[in-house]
Amino acid sequence: MSARILDGKAMADTILAVIHDKVAEREVQGKRRPGLAVILVGGDPASAVYVRNKKRACERAGVNSVSHDLPETTTQPELLALIDTLNSDAAIDGILVQLPLPVHIDAETVIERIRPDKDVDGFHPYNIGRLAVKMPTLRPSTPRGIMTLLRATNEELRGKNAVMVGASNIVGRPMSLELLLAGCTITVCHSATRDLESFVRSAEVLVVGVGRPRMIPGDWVREGAIVIDVGINRLADGKLVGDVDFDTAVERAGWITPVPGGVGPMTVATLLENTLEAALMHNP
């Protein structure tokens, strides 16, 4: 068999168009556009690309974006002071701090400084906690985007065996909560997991997000499984690949996301969905 492709780019385009129309409706009603502040500290090339993609998406969705490109030498108190200013700015509905941050800045402290109702990445402990107790508000953007992809399969998720490979705060942990909320029986695999292969083979829904190119061989994938590859890794020859060996997995899976063009565009689109939701909270 050959898997059906979950085209994240096409879905993201649809989401951005819907947001654009909703923003236009709000403007007709005399309401302001949603505002997103994007903070980049330092000159990491990959981070700069991600920020540029988010700005382009804002333009397409009709969301006002304000950029704060700070030098590598920015101190933690300086960054926190900027966040305080943005927290108090009524025109800003969402605050995004591009990760990773320079080593002298503590990311957890920075994330916790963002007002939870402006935390459109969904990283704040308050928002993670609400997700954990089945009362989500602003959901973590990558897991929320993945859930949109999963729903697009029209398969019943309730009761399925789901395996999350990776336990990061950004993807693995909140993704496991989303799958639990959807009624899956969820297993989280991490660096201390023994016999990873056996867990992967059992997965009817497999989500992988570890940042290691092709670490999951395609022949581990269960026949007919839904495979979501969060990883994006650049090889020495410049090729971008995921954490799953796509070329072999595509022959066994029922559904699979490509890399690039799968989870990445959905993360950006979901970020703007969250920004619109925040705007609706601030200016109904």
Swiss-Prot record:
Q: Which UniProt keywords apply?
A: Amino-acid biosynthesis, Histidine biosynthesis, Hydrolase, Methionine biosynthesis, Multifunctional enzyme, NADP, One-carbon metabolism, Oxidoreductase, Purine biosynthesis
- Any one of the GO BP annotations: tetrahydrofolate interconversion
User: Matching InterPro entries, A to Z?
Assistant: Aminoacid_DH-like_N_sf, NAD(P)-bd_dom_sf, THF_DH/CycHdrlase, THF_DH/CycHdrlase_cat_dom, THF_DH/CycHdrlase_CS, THF_DH/CycHdrlase_NAD-bd_dom
This protein's GO cellular component annotations are: cytosol
Q: In which pathway does it act?
A: One-carbon metabolism; tetrahydrofolate interconversion
Which reaction is catalysed here? (6R)-5,10-methylene-5,6,7,8-tetrahydrofolate + NADP(+) = (6R)-5,10-methenyltetrahydrofolate + NADPH; (6R)-5,10-methenyltetrahydrofolate + H2O = (6R)-10-formyltetrahydrofolate + H(+)
SUPFAM superfamilies to which the protein is assigned, alphabetical: Aminoacid dehydrogenase-like, N-terminal domain, NAD(P)-binding Rossmann-fold domains
The EC number of this protein is: 1.5.1.5, 3.5.4.9
- Cross-referenced CDD domains: NAD_bind_m-THF_DH_Cyclohyd
Specify which residues bind NADP(+) according to the UniProt entry for this protein: G166, A167, S168, S191, I232
One Pfam family recorded for the sequence: THF_DHG_CYH
Q: Which GO terms describe its molecular function?
A: methenyltetrahydrofolate cyclohydrolase activity; methylenetetrahydrofolate dehydrogenase (NADP+) activity
Quaternary structure, from the entry: Homodimer.
State its role: Catalyzes the oxidation of 5,10-methylenetetrahydrofolate to 5,10-methenyltetrahydrofolate and then the hydrolysis of 5,10-methenyltetrahydrofolate to 10-formyltetrahydrofolate.
Q: Which family is this sequence assigned to? A: Belongs to the tetrahydrofolate dehydrogenase/cyclohydrolase family.
* The protein, known as: Bifunctional protein FolD
Organism of this sequence: Thiobacillus denitrificans (strain ATCC 25259 / T1)
Q: Taxonomic lineage per UniProt?
A: Bacteria, Pseudomonadati, Pseudomonadota, Betaproteobacteria, Nitrosomonadales
